[in-house]
Amino acid sequence: MARKTPIERYRNIGISAHIDAGKTTTTERILFYTGVNHKIGEVHDGAATMDWMEQEQERGITITSAATTAFWKGMGGNYPEHRFNIIDTPGHVDFTIEVERSMRVLDGACMVYCAVGGVQPQSETVWRQANKYGVPRLAFVNKMDRTGANFFKVYDQLKTRLKANPVPVVVPIGAEDGFQGVVDLLEMKAIIWDEASQGVKFEYKDIPAELQATAEEWREKMVESAAEASEALMEKYLGGEELTRAEIVKALRDRTIACEIQPMLCGTAFKNKGVQRMLDAVIDFLPSPVDIPPVKGVDENDDEKKLERKADDNEKFSALAFKIMTDPFVGQLIFFRVYSGKINSGDTVYNPVKQKKERLGRILQMHANQREEIKEVLAGDIAAAVGLKDATTGDTLCDPTAPIVLERMVFPEPVISQAVEPKTKADQEKMGIALNRLAAEDPSFRVRTDEESGQTIISGMGELHLEILVDRMKREFGVEANIGAPQVAYRETIRKKAEDVEGKFVKQSGGRGQYGHAVITLEPQEPGKGFEFVDAIKGGVIPREYIPAVEKGIVDTLPSGILAGFPVVDVKVTLTFGSYHDVDSNENAFRMAGSMAFKDAMRKASPVLLEPMMAVEVETPEDYTGTVMGDLSSRRGIVQGMDDMVGGGKIIKAEVPLSEMFGYSTSLRSATQGRATYTMEFKHYSEAPKNIAEAVMAAKGTK
């Protein structure tokens, strides 16, 4: 099957933003203008095409990144047909993991900002993730029709808060109720969209006289940014020559793809203005799969051996599975991005991470939650596969004759846990299946059984995250469950060095005995360094074959510390000495000796409890700043600063222990009459004060 669209005309893009910047509405308009959707879905009515899980429609929050394909020939029909694969990403901080994994497979992103709210806390998180993966981006300032809308203020915030380098390619005509359209700085014409056709038709007009000077000033800035792309252009520009439209577009494109600048546009998706011009900017400035460096990977048997794959149909097939979803009709769907080569349904793919071959069943292309079955996918495509049993998020799928492991995604450790139990005994088994399926879809969600109490414990990134998963269990799997009070994921570590601590396991019970003896030194590591084991045995005092057993004994003890049974982190163990018995020594005895030595060393090394600290940002009207700050302080929070918001109001930044944040949304709503909102994300672990540590230990029955 020949390609319908050359790969140079592919754009794999994400639409990402803060919660209420109007991202889903913007995506809806994109689908409408690209001719896929004939009736526009509004988030306000809970009918948006991209928000396809029932809960998203109820809450008006986008949770899962649905992937959709659309086609665009330019708003005036003046471009050859381009193919957009659009990934809608959630803007709520509990779902940051979703944003992160979509960033991994994107080639470019449209960052949507609210013209009133400007750059909000979540925007900074998303921006950092885009930096991490080197994703070229455009900025789209939405909601220009709202009271308090200010395009240039958002421009200033992009520079100061995100350290971005925005280059407006349009400026607004009017704002708030008076927002009519935009001045296109490339054409130096005003674009006015026709409201009767929902913005499908438009006309170019002369720039309003009162905007002429503003338009010329911003065009000059845009041309200067373009000239900085190369010395030849700079000479031409400084020599007073006009740069052509094609030269400006190519120069801005090169600089955008190099992540040096971000073209900036504006509009109001709700009133059908501006999104069309943004789609043209996606074609003009964002990269196709061949404009970015080839994807990198390593040999499956040798991490040092670097490999790469070009975005070309004739290369060997390679793809990354970036999302798993359970679909009510076809079962498990695995979304994957093809980086190189092509594959047909029915072909065999190899998963080097799991070292298994699997047959690719049906391949579906998604349009939000409608689907079309296709026979073949090519380099640059994003599709969903049915019938892969072993693949999980972050796995590579490739040609069995040319294995490659593409860069894995790193997922954060959960910070909050809750016990969950089914309301009826009959649901016990169903609950197990449901939880395992949800955990397969979402790598930041974990399920385990507490050995002591036998309870099922679920862990995730925040209260909302777990609430939504329990909700999904009820809707999708029909399992009603009760959940316990949230539990904080504390950790344990040590503050000083404990030298030469011994563990001796000796058992003499007629016949063959047991004998293991290990001496260790335990010392703290810097935060985040994890566990390290050093073998410093000299002269064979412990035979080689027993040393891994000592390490295993210690590793098996790490998940349950001595203070309150929490995992031990950031410690280094050096095995320095020991002894053995020719007959009685065995691996099990040395495992026990290692475990005993470690527990004893922990007691002697000033063990402490660590608690997760959260970065909390509260957006509040000015009248409530005192109340909010007082409340944060009473929760052991440390206020770190305060910023002004575009449309008035303040952003308060603080660091607060997670244990003090339960139920915060309710108390914040009541303290500010529902006018303040907050976001929170995990920052780091820090030592819990003595009274808190004692209370935790007492609750665990270890005090």
UniProtKB/Swiss-Prot annotation:
One Gene Ontology molecular-function label: guanosine tetraphosphate binding
Transmembrane spans: none
Cellular component terms (Gene Ontology): cytoplasm
PROSITE patterns referenced in this protein's UniProt entry, alphabetically: G_TR_1, G_TR_2
Keyword ATP-binding: no
Record SUPFAM superfamilies: EF-G C-terminal domain-like, P-loop containing nucleoside triphosphate hydrolases, Ribosomal protein S5 domain 2-like, Translation proteins
Cellular compartments annotated: Cytoplasm
CDD domains per the UniProt record, alphabetical: EF-G, EFG_III, EFG_mtEFG1_IV, EFG_mtEFG_C, EFG_mtEFG_II
Gene3D superfamilies assigned: 3.30.230.10, 3.30.70.240, Elongation Factor G (Translational Gtpase), domain 3, P-loop containing nucleotide triphosphate hydrolases, Translation factors
Keyword Cytoplasm attributed: yes
InterPro entries found in the cross-reference section: EFG_II, EFG_III, EFG_III/V, EFG_IV, EFG_V, EFG_V-like, EFTu-like_2, G_TR_CS
Boundaries of every tr-type G domain copy: 8-290
Alphabetized UniProt keyword annotations: Cytoplasm, Elongation factor, GTP-binding, Nucleotide-binding, Protein biosynthesis
Family in the record: Belongs to the TRAFAC class translation factor GTPase superfamily. Classic translation factor GTPase family. EF-G/EF-2 subfamily.
Described function: Catalyzes the GTP-dependent ribosomal translocation step during translation elongation. During this step, the ribosome changes from the pre-translocational (PRE) to the post-translocational (POST) state as the newly formed A-site-bound peptidyl-tRNA and P-site-bound deacylated tRNA move to the P and E sites, respectively. Catalyzes the coordinated movement of the two tRNA molecules, the mRNA and conformational changes in the ribosome.
Listed name of the protein: Elongation factor G 1
Gene that this polypeptide is encoded by: fusA
